[in-house]
């Protein structure tokens, strides 16, 4: 029998809802899935868990006195992280604003949504397919994860991959290669 010697401790990345059949929440999640082109509700729960942890940290830091070193240091780091992700503006640099963040704010920063808003795709579902099929890159890195959270400074570097068959002068697609092969054999 083969023994596994590489044990890993995985932390939780999402939490299912406490009440599984709450009608208002289910309708709200279904609308979000349609609007943002999500595969399933697990993607919503993952982002909600991320925001819940950020809010929990902010609430803990707000209980500390203003001049506490931990509050200043960790609070500044949390605000910097949220600003870099585009969740907070430069004008909203206080821990109170982290408590008012919504899931939709984080859904707006997903690569799938940003690609659609930049006009690189025809629809939100088309954006998901382009990302999965490796037609989109961020900077010099090809990204094939639709849930990739786009930073503010990376947003201007999102474009079509030069190796994509959809780009003029890119690698030819499967049918184009087949036609070229049949023309050569004739």
From Swiss-Prot:
Belongs to the universal ribosomal protein uS4 family. InterPro entries: Ribosomal_uS4, Ribosomal_uS4_CS, Ribosomal_uS4_euk/arc, Ribosomal_uS4_N, S4_RNA-bd, S4_RNA-bd_sf. This is Small ribosomal subunit protein uS4. Residues 174-186 have a biased composition (Basic residues). The keyword Glycoprotein does not apply. GO terms for cellular component: cytosolic small ribosomal subunit. The gene is RPS9. One of its GO terms (biological process) is ribosomal small subunit biogenesis. GO terms for molecular function: rRNA binding; structural constituent of ribosome. Keywords: Ribonucleoprotein, Ribosomal protein, RNA-binding, rRNA-binding. Residues 109-184 form the S4 RNA-binding domain. PANTHER family: 30S 40S RIBOSOMAL PROTEIN, 40S RIBOSOMAL PROTEIN S9. The keyword RNA-binding applies. Residues 167-186 are annotated as: Disordered.
């Amino acid at each position: 029998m083969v023994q596994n010697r590489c044990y890993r401790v995985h932390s939780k990345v999402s939490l299912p809802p406490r009440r599984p059949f709450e009608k208002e929440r289910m309708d709200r999640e279904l609308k979000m899935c349609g609007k943002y082109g999500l595969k399933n509700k697990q993607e919503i729960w993952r982002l909600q868990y991320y925001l819940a942890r950020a809010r929990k940290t902010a609430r803990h830091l707000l209980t500390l006195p203003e001049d506490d070193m931990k509050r200043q240091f960790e609070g500044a780091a949390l605000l910097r992280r949220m600003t870099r992700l585009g969740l907070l503006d430069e004008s909203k640099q206080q821990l109170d604003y982290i408590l008012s963040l919504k899931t939709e704010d984080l859904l707006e920063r997903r690569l799938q949504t940003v690609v659609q808003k930049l006009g690189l795709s025809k629809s939100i579902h088309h954006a998901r397919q382009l990302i999965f099929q490796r037609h989109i890159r961020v900077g010099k890195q090809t990204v094939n994860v639709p849930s990739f959270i786009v930073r503010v400074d990376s947003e201007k570097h999102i474009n079509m991959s030069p190796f994509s068959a959809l780009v003029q002068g890119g690698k030819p697609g499967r049918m184009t290669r087949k036609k070229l092969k049949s023309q050569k054999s004739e």
